[in-house]
Amino acid sequence: MSTNSFFAKFLRFIGIVLMALTGGFTFLGGVGTFCAAVFPQKYESMAGLIPYQWLYILFMLGTIAIGVWGIWAAIKLIKGTTDAYWMSLYALIAGVLVGGFHIYMSRMLRGKSMPVDAVVYTTLLTLVIFLLFKIPMIWQGVDFSKAKASDNKKAGGAAAILVGLFTLTIQYTMGSTHTWGGVNYADAFNTSMAVIGIGLLLLGAGIFVSLRNVRETALRLQVQQ
């Protein structure tokens, strides 16, 4: 498979977008564990977590760290660095292991584990796809370090917009699993999430605008020649 073939570009695009979404989702999942980790005594459904509060604080910090790791890996994929793929793979494996243990403990202590499940299943899907990328025939074309920077930047722009939209709507998409006593705690960091979400939307739009300007400039130079 050629590095510049449509299929190779498509797979790289999917890989970068999925990695960025997974990193962002994991980070937000870690932030969303704050209430259960720091104030389990405030919620009747979290009473079983009180003796293990220290563990849930570790889950929260670990998940946030893995989320940042995943986002950093996605940025490296966009830049096409030689260590980008393996960094992504290690971050995904860490996410599955820590998230899987989190699911096990939550189901054992309080009988359910949502929304951790959604984060782990997303991470597992991305991990499977990245493992498939390493099949020799596929990797020959997908290899992120050999791609044109402009192709990867398109995926980066799309990823920034999608993560931005997800950040802006997290209080609605996760409201059902974060509502106790009629209060939606997924909306606890509304201002911060709004600022981050809008910032990501502007970043994504800016990337596409800059790529368009570069393309138009290149076309004008060709015409002049």
Predicted feature residues:
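Topology signature of small-to-medium multi-pass alpha-helical membrane proteins
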Residues: 1-225
